Amino acid sequence: MATDPRKILVTCALPYANGSIHLGHMLEHIQADIWVRYQRLRGNDVNFICADDAHGTPIMLKAQQMGISPEEMIAAVSEEHQKDFAGFDISFDNYHSTHSDENRELASHIYLELKKNGFITSRTISQLFDPEKEMFLPDRFVKGTCPKCKAEEQYGDNCDNCGETYSPTDLINPKSAVSGATPVMKDSEHFFFDLPQFESMLKEWTRSGSLQTETANKMQEWFESGLQQWDISRDAPYFGFEIPGETNKFFYVWLDAPIGYMGSFKNLCNKRDDLNFDEYWKKDSTTELYHFIGKDIVYFHSLFWPAMLDGAGFRKPNNVFVHGYVTVNGAKMSKSKGTFIKAGTYLNHLDPECLRYYYAAKLNSRIDDLDLNLEDFTQRVNSDVVNKIVNLASRNAGFITKRFDGKLADNFAEPELYNEFIAAADRIAELYETREFGRAIREITALADKANQYIDEKAPWVLAKEEGKEQELQEVSSVGINLFRVLMAYLKPVMPELAARTEAFLNETLTWEGVAQPLVAHEITKFKALFARIDPKKVEAMIEESKEDAAIEMAAKEKAEAEKEKASQTELDKDPIADEIEFDAFEAVDMRIARIISCEEVPKANKLLKFQLDIGGETRQVFSGIKSAYKPEELEGKLTVMVANLKPRKMKFGMSEGMILAAGPGGKDLWILEPHEGAQPGMRVM
């Protein structure tokens, strides 16, 4: 008896909109996409959504550094993110942004509901404040010396050197990472979500049995240490949504970020008539909601998020699926080693389906870190996908197309073997459902081994040379093609592009239930190469490009730091005061007010302008090296200051009878001295 399709809403954690997608991000998105594609393959109604997390201080400051608005920056980043996800065949139904009208409305609604229900409190707190930038500083925007190990240049929340955690006020000699200024303490009213009121509900949710064991255990630790009120506000300047009814107060990015799941779905509902927002988010919804996230954000998704939803009258997630981190070659991803690999860099060199397969082969339902060993990656994909699975088709297709006009045998010669392959469907289905993808892949490759063993034993290449073996050759090759068909149906959630090419070859759409019966008397198309093996040289080229990208980024960062350091210097730091002189020496310099009668460029001189100056009854010709800062027509008629008793100097272009005074380091940064109104040509400057 057929059951109604499940209605499922699936989300991935929202990538932050200030940088590129890398292979660490791709683990989660590939994991979720495989699960979503499996559910769709089984006939379930799935909506798969995501968005960019587009608010917060880091985005505001990076946009300032780039000289563009935050809106311009997040739009460009969103375009890049969506291109990368599409490159890996991540089948989102909608990709949106937390900086959207839908998200603003929902964040305001949830906040006001929480406030109305008594879950929002306020109090005055003291925070570090940058007096130059006039902004409060998040922990990661304060640097100083670790109070424990005395390591310098440590962030305001923890020490990378010794691992100590502390308050930013504990740092020795704290400095603003934004301006370099010494921060001061300043009071401000902040708003808090009263999380402790939800402890009983959260404990019950934890005991539901659906959460991963590691997540439930971690939540128990948090319960034992005591839940704390959560600061959900930030002061201006801040890029985000203003809190309703408040002035210069904004929602902390982590309040509106998970609401972005709802905002993205709301945006999708506005595009489609068949979707109802309330059906999926109302308190008593019978639909299913699942979040795929990394282990670094469990706290927000397992405590704050379900509590916020419950307090505002919405449903809670059915589950939060947590994964570990990605390491490369057994170590943390490294820019200097070229193992911090951006998604776009990978796509420049390798087939995305290779990574999809490798991640699937190593994923399970636990919160384990996954190591992308590049040598093993190459060997496993080439061995499993090319040698075992795709080779099964290539070994048999030629006989069918050349000898039998592309037609499979009228009867199926190995029903028992085929039934063994079909019997594995329920086991593999359960493994997909429970996210035990690695075990599912092992089941599939074990079947591939059996299929290849059968072909090795029957040796169709030998049968092709023997008279009277035509029917057996067709039957054996047809068995091989059909077993390949079953394997590809099972692999379709993992390798959708390979599955699509297989469907074109088989002249049939692959479905989970459809492969229950073999293809007989069915016409296939001429075999074309379905999948290319990984060339180790392409892996090396990917690493080299990653190193080059890192070097360019480092050079740009160092340049920006140098410019920041230079900008923080005073003019006296840049150009210290000269040695003292006696008053008589100064008195010997005769400075006079001069009116610029005319100014013109000097032919063949890169820096010089030629001036005619009126100094009150006398005209002087002066050459001055300020061409890079001024156009001649900008200066004519202005008053300025000149040294009038400087000994005339004969130059290539004529006699210079004095010196015009200007301030600045040089180049375009030069400014002539201009007296106030009332000064007259010829007056002495005292």
UniProtKB/Swiss-Prot annotation:
Subcellular location: Cytoplasm
Reactions the enzyme catalyzes: tRNA(Met) + L-methionine + ATP = L-methionyl-tRNA(Met) + AMP + diphosphate
Family annotation (InterPro entries): aa-tRNA-synth_I_CS, Anticodon_Met, Met-tRNA-synth_bsu_C, Met-tRNA_ligase_1, Met-tRNA_synth, Methionyl/Leucyl_tRNA_Synth, MetRS_core, MetRS_Zn
Residues involved in ATP binding: 335
Residue ranges constituting the tRNA-binding domain according to the UniProt record: 585-686
Motif segment ('HIGH' region): 15-25
Main localisation: cytoplasm
Motif 'KMSKS' region per UniProt: ranges: 332-336
Binding site for Zn(2+): 146, 149, 159, 162
Entry protein name: Methionine--tRNA ligase
Organism taxonomic ancestry: Bacteria, Pseudomonadati, Pseudomonadota, Gammaproteobacteria, Vibrionales
